[in-house]
């Protein structure tokens, strides 16, 4: 269950602002050697099909979590990133359960 200050949005396309927020989250949570630029993130997204994005927004402005399902090479995949300040609070579990409502087979990308 999400705190009242948070909501989840779901979309198949991301706005430029959403992409920027996801890049910031990615770069905060992954090691420096896995840092991604906005243009590299666009290339990353373009390499996959049937995308669905789930964004956890806190206080109507701050991205604290992102989940992404996509097709690649005939398989269905997912990825989840949660802000380190919000890890251990069940947000990843909430996102995974949302994904599992529509998917019966998934491969994780970490």
Say what each PLM segment does.
Residues 1-39:
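Short amphipathic alpha-helix that is part of the acyltransferase structural core
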Residues 2, 47-50, 100-102:
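Flexible, charged surface loops at secondary-structure boundaries
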Residues 17, 77, 90:
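Residues that form or flank phosphate/diphosphate-binding pockets in enzymes
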Residues 31-54, 58:
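Active-site rim helix/loop that mediates acceptor-substrate recognition in acyltransferases
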Residues 56, 61-71, 76-81:
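Conserved beta-strand in the GNAT
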Residues 88-101:
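Conserved acetyl-CoA-binding loop-helix of GNAT-fold acetyltransferases
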Residues 101-110:
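Conserved GNAT acetyl-CoA-binding A-motif
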